[in-house]
Swiss-Prot record:
It is an enzyme of class 2 (transferase). The active site is at D155. This is Polyamine aminopropyltransferase. Its main location: cytoplasm. Catalyzes the irreversible transfer of a propylamine group from the amino donor S-adenosylmethioninamine (decarboxy-AdoMet) to putrescine (1,4-diaminobutane) to yield spermidine. The gene is speE. S-methyl-5'-thioadenosine binds at Q31, E106, D137, G138. Pfam families: Spermine_synt_N (PF17284), Spermine_synth (PF01564). Spermidine binds at D86, D155, S156, T157, D158.
């Protein structure tokens, strides 16, 4: 008997993944957590029935939210990760010897424990001595911060349920206040391909565009994400993601990556026409 995991992307489209076995299933105070071993994607974790990452593609997301801003900011020392309980973003950040301190704010302790158990090669990022872990609501944590971080990475899940507050105008305003004068914020921007997802992308871009003087969007191909096409947001008080990219400095670090390069960095901001159009429409409202 074959076992399949199904995730609906719309009422008319779903992704089916053939499963070898279910490794874990549990209900935390915030969400249902499942871990599967699949034939195609290796181990993968799902929250409330939606794939968060898998063995085969987590490196794409984690590298793109980390190395894009780090190749632009000349000296990011203090960093905040909101979400990030799997440890993947922290794993990439601790590659930088210049990083002095990283705060990780995660709501769900069970999710962290599950990732440490089943994805130790990812969660190892949380074990570095520069990491401080907080189990708290991201927005509540941010309200207490002012002029503190060089970089904020919003690594939360979709804008629903207990993470909904991390996609509001207040949240982006709080990020702005928590950043230093030349700070950068990076966040997942979702997929613009399906109509319902496009609406969320539009709303998100409109809020960030009004909150930061520099707001750009970039892209990556992530197979387990809805439509396989994923956007990220880059918002900054000072630095432009292309004009201020210091490719020579980043390349000389010699960091090992599987997806990100400084050549790809430039190309990631070259968006399809339909995506450019929908973003520009929101900028004129």
């Amino acid at each position: 008997m074959q076992m399949w995991f199904s995730q609906y992307h719309t009422v008319n489209v779903k992704l089916d993944v053939r499963i070898q076995e279910q490794l874990f299933s549990g209900q935390s105070d915030y969400q249902k957590i499942d871990v599967f071993k699949s034939y195609e994607f290796g181990k993968m974790v799902a929250l409330d029935g939606e794939i968060v990452f898998s063995d085969t593609d987590e490196f794409i997301y984690d590298e793109m939210v980390t190395h894009v801003p780090m190749a632009v900011h000349p000296n990011a020392k203090r960093i905040l990760i909101i979400g990030g309980g799997d440890g993947g973003v922290a794993k990439e950040l601790i590659k930088y010897p210049s990083v002095e301190h990283i705060d990780v704010v995660e709501t769900d302790k069970m999710f962290v424990d599950v990732c440490r158990r089943f994805f130790p090669e990812v969660a190892c990022g949380l074990e570095d001595e520069r990491i401080s872990m907080f189990y708290d609501d991201g927005l509540r944590f941010l309200r207490r911060k002012h002029d503190e971080y060089d970089l904020i990475i919003n690594d939360s899940t979709d804008p629903l349920g207990h993470t909904e507050g991390l996609f509001t105008k207040e949240f982006y305003g709080s990020c702005y206040k928590a950043l230093k004068d030349d700070g950068i914020m990076v966040y997942q921007h979702g997929s613009p391909f399906y109509d319902e997802d496009e609406l969320e992308c539009r709303k998100m871009h409109r809020k960030v565009y009004k909150s930061f003087p520099i707001s750009r969007v970039y892209q990556a191909h992530i197979p387990t994400c809805p439509s396989g096409y994923w956007l990220f947001g880059f918002a900054s008080k000072k630095y432009h993601p292309l004009y201020d990219l210091d490719a020579k400095r980043w390349d000389e670090l010699g960091l090992k990556t599987w997806y990100y390069t400084t050549h790809l960095h430039r190309g990631a901001f070259m968006l399809p026409k339909y995506v450019e159009d929908l973003l520009e429409e929101e900028e004129t409202k």
